[in-house]
């Protein structure tokens, strides 16, 4: 497509008509230094669209992670320091199952340890240490935290959103890898692999 200049720079008029505008566009096309748009290939367009959607989903996910942390700071503040990230699978599974400090304190010890072992896969010692930390955090939260039913509802709601975003983000990453793998011989993919060789540059 032709890149045309703003019509207000050519003539000032109150009434616009097709005859004048078409003539102006034709005159622009006669210029020897005419610039035209460079249309990317379908492969580049697909990669660009998926990358944009990936980062958009990541931004939305981060917003719900912040909301989850905000709720926990009020209802269960000591829980935030137990795991490396509050959004790892073990942490989210525990919060989905019990959510409130009182629920953790009432829960069966072995049940919590089994959940930690099955999701973290670091062994019994790790699971027991995390259990002790959670119980201590729950005990402290009963004294310093403040939780009502709406906090529990929102914590579980935010976790469900985070899990859904994780699912869609992983789906987009899989699609990107499939797209690249299917076009290994193209110059575009070769350029991607070249960029990946730079220190600090990843797949995206």
What kind of region is each of these model predictions?
Residues 1-204:
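A detector of single, family-specific signature residues
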């Amino acid at each position: 497509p032709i890149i045309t200049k703003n019509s207000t720079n050519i003539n000032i008029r109150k009434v616009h008509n097709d005859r004048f505008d078409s003539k102006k566009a034709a005159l622009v096309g006669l210029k020897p230094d005419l610039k035209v748009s460079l249309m990317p290939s379908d492969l580049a367009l697909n990669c660009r669209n998926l990358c944009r959607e990936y980062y958009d989903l990541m931004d939305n996910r981060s917003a719900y992670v912040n909301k989850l942390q905000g709720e926990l700071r009020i209802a269960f503040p000591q829980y935030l320091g137990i795991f490396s990230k509050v959004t790892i699978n073990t942490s989210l599974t525990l919060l989905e199952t019990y959510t409130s400090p009182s629920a953790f304190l009432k829960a069966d010890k072995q049940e919590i340890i089994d959940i930690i072992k099955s999701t973290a896969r670091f062994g019994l010692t790790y699971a027991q240490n995390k259990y002790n930390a959670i119980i201590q955090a729950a005990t402290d939260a009963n004294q310093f935290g403040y939780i009502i039913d709406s906090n529990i509802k929102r914590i579980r709601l935010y976790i469900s959103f985070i899990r859904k975003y994780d699912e869609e983000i992983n789906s987009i990453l899989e699609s990107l890898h499939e797209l690249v793998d299917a076009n290994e011989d193209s110059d575009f993919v070769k350029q991607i692999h070249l960029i990946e060789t730079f220190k600090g540059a990843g797949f995206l």
